[in-house]
A protein has these predicted regions:
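Extracytoplasmic/secreted envelope proteins and their assembly/folding machinery
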Residues: 96-101, 124, 155-159
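Charged, often glycine-rich, active-site loop that binds/positions anionic groups
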Residues: 123-136
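Active-site acidic/histidine clusters and adjacent loop/turn architecture
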Residues: 62-113
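Catalytic cores and adjacent binding grooves of peptidoglycan-active enzymes
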Residues: 16-17, 51, 133-192
Length: 192
């Protein structure tokens, strides 16, 4: 009788050739994963965006209309990274924007938040007189500096990565949670 009960249970069990629901789910998931495009292709299709926190403008940094390369060029960079206080524009080198793009690609983020790019000399002087953390020989009035952050990336982690990759100045502002990069000589400092 025990043999009959065991035979009945074995007859009802699924045959090994029939995959279980779990096996079918895992196989479908693996197929979907292998059909995804390569990461390099995704980067080409999806631009990196910059959001200017002072002017509330959003522009593509990469792609055919991007500020790093392409049709926008120097005029587009000058307009986007302009002084928010005077609306004065200064030359922002493509090499500076390329550092920001490299950081975004390294940390796999699609948005960069810009705090400050070109800073008009009068505005820089005003900040100095108010006692703000502004260098007397700041690179911002020359158009050679950008303050920025990457959402979802710790400012310290971004700072440490930039120290190893960027050949210019790198400043770290842990309380304000942003970093400064410029094209002057290699140096580093810590602000608030």
């Amino acid at each position: 009788m025990l043999a009959l009960a065991l035979a009945a249970v074995l007859a009802q069990a699924p045959t090994p050739s029939t995959p279980s629901k779990k096996d079918a789910y895992l196989a479908a998931k693996q197929d979907a994963h292998t059909r995804r495009p390569a990461r390099a292709t995704q980067r080409a299709d999806r631009p990196i965006w910059a959001r200017n926190l002072r002017t509330h403008e959003i522009r593509a940094l990469t792609g055919p209309s991007g500020l790093a390369e392409g049709a926008a060029g120097q005029a587009g960079r000058s307009a986007f990274f302009r002084c928010w206080f005077t609306h004065g524009e200064g030359p922002i080198p493509a090499a500076l924007v390329a550092v920001i793009v490299a950081a975004a690609e390294h940390f796999e983020v699609r948005e960069v938040q810009i705090i400050s790019g070109f800073r008009h000399p009068k505005y820089n002087l005003l900040l100095t007189k108010k006692g703000r953390e502004v260098a007397t020989k700041s690179q911002h009035p020359l158009g050679n500096a950008i303050d920025f952050l990457l959402p979802e990336v710790e400012a310290r982690e971004l700072y440490e990565w930039l120290l190893g990759t960027h050949d210019g100045g790198v400043g770290f502002y842990p309380i304000s949670e942003f970093v400064h990069i410029d094209l002057a000589r290699k140096r580093t400092w810590r602000g608030t």
